[in-house]
UniProtKB/Swiss-Prot annotation:
Site note Essential for channel activity, possibly by being protonated during channel activation, and by forming the channel gate and the selective filter, residues: 37
Cellular compartment(s): Virion membrane; Host apical cell membrane
Top-level taxonomic group: Viruses
UniProt-recorded name of the protein: Matrix protein 2
Membrane-spanning parts: 23-43
Organism: Influenza A virus (strain A/Turkey/Minnesota/501/1978 H6N8)
Physiological role: Forms a proton-selective ion channel that is necessary for the efficient release of the viral genome during virus entry. After attaching to the cell surface, the virion enters the cell by endocytosis. Acidification of the endosome triggers M2 ion channel activity.
Domain notes: Cytoplasmic tail plays an important role in virion assembly and morphogenesis.
Subunit field text: Homotetramer; composed of two disulfide-linked dimers held together by non-covalent interactions. May interact with matrix protein 1.
Amino acid sequence: MSLLTEVETPTRNGWECKCSDSSDPLVIAASIIGILHLILWILDRLFFKCIYRRIKYGLKRGPSTEGVPESMREEYRQEQQSAVDVDDGHFVNIELE
């Protein structure tokens, strides 16, 4: 005798909801909220880097330079670059023998 014939399989009635008041509006609302929460949680986990980067830095890439003369813009760029160069010099190279 095969093992497959001795395994009990659930009947169609076994999968049905046993709640007598499943048509209650509160149960339906809770189910919808639960499904929406699950969908939002999955989207959050998939795109959390993009979402929180937008919140942290906003849509702009930097301060607005509208109405600022070109010479001041160039000076600002040089200051930013020198600040980056200083940060690069902060690291120490250690050589092991």
